[in-house]
Structure formats: C-alpha cells, structure tokens
C-alpha cells in the first residue's frame, strides 16, 4: 500500500519488518502479498497481478513452488475451485512444521498454504469482490487473514467506488473507531496515503497537485532463504497435569518446543 507500482521498494520494507518475526517462507508470504498490492495499483488484470507478483519470490523456494502449483491447477481446473483446493490439500496441506500447534493435527498455518488460499480466491473470484473473499474464507485454516488479503488486493485493483455498496455502507459505522486501541481505518488510510506519496517521490516519481507519476519497478526476486531446513518431528509427549517444579529435559536433536500454561496465585496464563 505504501509502494504503489514499486514492487521492489515494497519488498525492501518486508525485508526489514518481516524479519522481526519470520524468515524463509514466512517472510516470502509478506513479500508476495506486498508485491500483489503494489501491482494492483497499476493493473486491472488479476492473473497478471498474481503471476507478476510471484517474480518477487526466488524460484528455488517452497513458497514459489506452491504458488506455481496453484496457478497451474487453476489452468487445469478453471471452473472448479474446490478441485484446485483439493490438490492444494493433498500436496501442501498435510503437516505444519513451522507452528507447534499444527504438528500431527489437522491444523496448518504454513505461509505457503495461506498464500495458496489467497490466490485461490483471487484467481477463481474473477474480479468479483464477494466471490473472492468467499472462496478464500471457505478454503479454511487462517480464514480471517486470507480473505482480508485477497479482498484487499482486489479492492485496491477495483478502487473504492467499485466496491459493493453493501460493504461500503457498513464501513461508515466503524471507520473512525480505533482498531484494538491503535488507529482507525480513516487514520490508517491517511497515514498510508502520505507514506505512498513520499515513496513515489523517493523512488524517482513525481507528485503533482492533481496527479502522480510513478516510476514503475519490474519485480526482482528476493534472496533465497530456507526456513526450518531438515526439521522434522521425532516425538510428541503430552503431560496432562500440573507440574510444580519443571524437570530437566534431555533430547537428541536440533530443538525442542515446550507448551503449557503458567499458573499463578490469581490467574493462569
């Protein structure tokens, strides 16, 4: 949103901000969504936005491979998003190793799976706002963030005036309310608009009184970064009771995850 038509500038922000909490595929998810947002400002072709945005991702990565599969399955089953969804589930949706909650259970928030659900909605939604968010929601898993991304990208492409009236009517109720005690929708929009104008000028474009000229950027792949390489689950142990003194845990491997709750005098966290 801050870098309209400037994919590589958007990816640079993702590099610095995304690496605070993610790396590898987790980082690429942000890069890809940012690239599609950036392209949505300058193109009305959703397939172009999906495929051109993918050029910001290194071809050797799992994320690139998964998105490429979805694009190819869309070509193979152009009228059946559920068939494409089944293919995603069979090949990519089986096991989450990045989030401990998803190991060996039917729960998967791997970034490439959620990226697949975003472009599933975009490709099969065919420019229809409600259809797009419906498909990304029904795909499952992280089903609030994914339709927010697919709907946001498509909404950027369409522009505010082309959004369905029933959604715009409801926005008026909440657009000045701070979200989780941070900023409101209107304030966030104002900040993003100002940042975008600054970015356009910084990257060689021009900002006039009634128009802007953007120095369009062709996507350049981000550096290759492989997350959780060679990592697999060896053992999962459940201790279904309270432990007053946590014991020493010995293991052979490269890491361990300990999950539980801390019980205090007045609360559990």
Regions found by a protein language model. Name each.
Residues 2-7, 15-21, 34-140:
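Accessory "access/gating" subregions that flank catalytic or transport cores
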Residues 223-268:
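Glycan-recognition and processing domains
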Residues 41, 78-88, 165-168, 191-210:
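Long, charge-rich low-complexity segments
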Residues 5-8, 162-164:
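Substrate-binding/catalytic groove segments of enzymes
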Residues 173-237:
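Primarily interfacial, aromatic-capped hydrophobic alpha-helices that serve as membrane anchors
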Residues 25, 33, 117-200:
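Catalytic phosphate/nucleotide-handling subdomain of diverse soluble enzymes
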Residues 47-61, 163-179, 202-210:
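A broadly tuned preference for mixed-charge, low-complexity surface segments
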